[in-house]
């Protein structure tokens, strides 16, 4: 019996070692530990032995069974380790290879223009103001000398918002950034009340909204407006400042500009600013003028003492001219092929 048990252990160890996959290993397990396996048959034969022999042989068989199970578990672990090593080898990463490039975004072309405008005017002492996009009817129209019957106040041109402010005034999406000029000027006057007040020099870039949409107009567009108010500011200063801005923005010294008489309710006199392009063509690029006395009063200033100028330009228009873009809608479509050109 002892020799038979030793042979079973040796045969089991050899069979398990020869198994190259789990299926083969399970088949070999059945040969030795299954219901009809060699050890199971020996255990069944213990009933034929006398009690003393049965006890000693039973202990010996159980010891051999533990050896066989240990050999089985060792082979299972070896196969699992081999499988894991093969998988790791197949999925190995060569850390010496260059990594994947990080996808980097870039500024939208209109934002590039926005930052460029701020930098140019900042270099000549202009502050940059910000303000709410939802404005009151008074701040957007009345404070800027727009009469009650002005067509811009109609729902065909302006997006009105449900509700009213704390003073029961109508709310709307601002149609220009001029309300920021009024807010800034009023804060400036309040800040220097009873003191010597320095000139008001500010630009107001921001989003504006109008009921309009075609190849050259959008219901939402970006605008920058400038304001310079002091005791001796003239129309000549307006011409010098804006012409110098265009030369720096387009990086050209041969810029030709003309001021064409026009009408705006918030300036008097008013002028459209045109810029010369090839073949003797002129293109409107900005509206401008001296700040109307009524607007100065609404800013808290004495029009008998203070005078100044204002201008307003579309940032999309400036961007289109700088980069030669023909359709305004390209700025809002989010086409990466278009935007990547400015990265």
Curated annotation (Swiss-Prot):
- The principal localisation class reads cytoplasm
EC?
A: 6.1.1.20
**PROSITE patterns per the record?**
AA_TRNA_LIGASE_II
Query: Is the Protein biosynthesis keyword given for this protein?
Result: yes
Q: Which cofactor does it need?
A: Mg(2+)
Cofactor binding note from Swiss-Prot or TrEMBL: Binds 2 magnesium ions per tetramer.
Its recorded reaction(s) are:
tRNA(Phe) + L-phenylalanine + ATP = L-phenylalanyl-tRNA(Phe) + AMP + diphosphate + H(+)
Keyword Transmembrane helix on entry: no
CDD domains noted in UniProt = PheRS_alpha_core
Q: Name one GO biological process term.
A: phenylalanyl-tRNA aminoacylation
Keywords (alphabetical) are:
Aminoacyl-tRNA synthetase, ATP-binding, Cytoplasm, Ligase, Magnesium, Metal-binding, Nucleotide-binding, Protein biosynthesis
Q: Can you cite an annotated GO cellular component?
A: cytoplasm
Binding positions (Mg(2+)): 268
Molecular-function GO terms, alphabetical:
ATP binding; magnesium ion binding; phenylalanine-tRNA ligase activity; tRNA binding
The record's subcellular location field reads: Cytoplasm
Name of the top EC class for this enzyme: ligase
What interactions and quaternary structure are annotated? Tetramer of two alpha and two beta subunits.
Q: Which HAMAP family match?
A: Phe_tRNA_synth_alpha1
**Family membership noted in the UniProt record:** Belongs to the class-II aminoacyl-tRNA synthetase family. Phe-tRNA synthetase alpha subunit type 1 subfamily.
Protein name listed in UniProt: Phenylalanine--tRNA ligase alpha subunit
Species source reads Cupriavidus taiwanensis (strain DSM 17343 / BCRC 17206 / CCUG 44338 / CIP 107171 / LMG 19424 / R1)
């Amino acid at each position: 019996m002892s020799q038979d048990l030793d042979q079973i252990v040796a045969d089991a160890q050899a069979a398990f070692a020869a198994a190259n996959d789990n299926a083969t290993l399970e088949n070999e397990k059945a040969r030795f530990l299954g219901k009809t396996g060699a050890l199971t048959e020996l255990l069944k034969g213990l009933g034929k032995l006398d009690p003393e022999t049965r006890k000693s042989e039973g202990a010996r068989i159980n010891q051999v069974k533990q050896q066989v199970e240990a050999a089985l578990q060792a082979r299972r672990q070896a196969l699992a380790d081999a499988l894991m090593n093969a998988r790791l080898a197949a999925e190995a990463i060569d850390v010496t290879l260059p990594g994947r490039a990080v996808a980097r975004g870039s500024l939208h072309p209109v934002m590039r223009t926005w930052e460029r405008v701020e930098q140019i005017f900042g270099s000549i002492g202009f502050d940059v103001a910000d303000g709410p996009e939802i404005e009151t009817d008074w701040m957007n129209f009345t404070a800027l000398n727009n009469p009650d019957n002005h067509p811009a106040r109609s729902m065909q041109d302006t997006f009105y918002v449900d509700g009213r402010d704390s003073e029961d005034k109508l709310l709307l999406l601002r149609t220009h950034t001029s309300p920021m000029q009024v807010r800034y000027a009023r804060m400036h006057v309040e800040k220097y009340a009873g003191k010597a007040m320095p000139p008001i020099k500010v630009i107001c870039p921001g989003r504006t909204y109008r009921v309009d949409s075609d190849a050259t107009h959008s219901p939402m567009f970006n605008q920058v407006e400038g304001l310079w108010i002091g005791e001796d500011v003239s129309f000549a200063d307006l011409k010098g400042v804006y012409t110098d801005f265009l030369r720096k923005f387009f990086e050209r010294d041969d810029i030709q500009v003309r001021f064409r008489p026009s009408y705006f309710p918030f300036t008097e006199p008013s002028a459209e600013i045109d810029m010369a392009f090839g073949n003797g063509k002129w293109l409107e690029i900005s509206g401008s003028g001296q700040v109307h006395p009524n607007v100065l009063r609404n800013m808290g200033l004495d029009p008998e003492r203070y005078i100044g100028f204002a201008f307003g330009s579309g940032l999309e228009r400036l961007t289109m001219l700088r980069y030669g873009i023909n359709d305004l809608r390209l700025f809002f479509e989010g086409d990466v092929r278009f935007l990547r050109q400015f990265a």
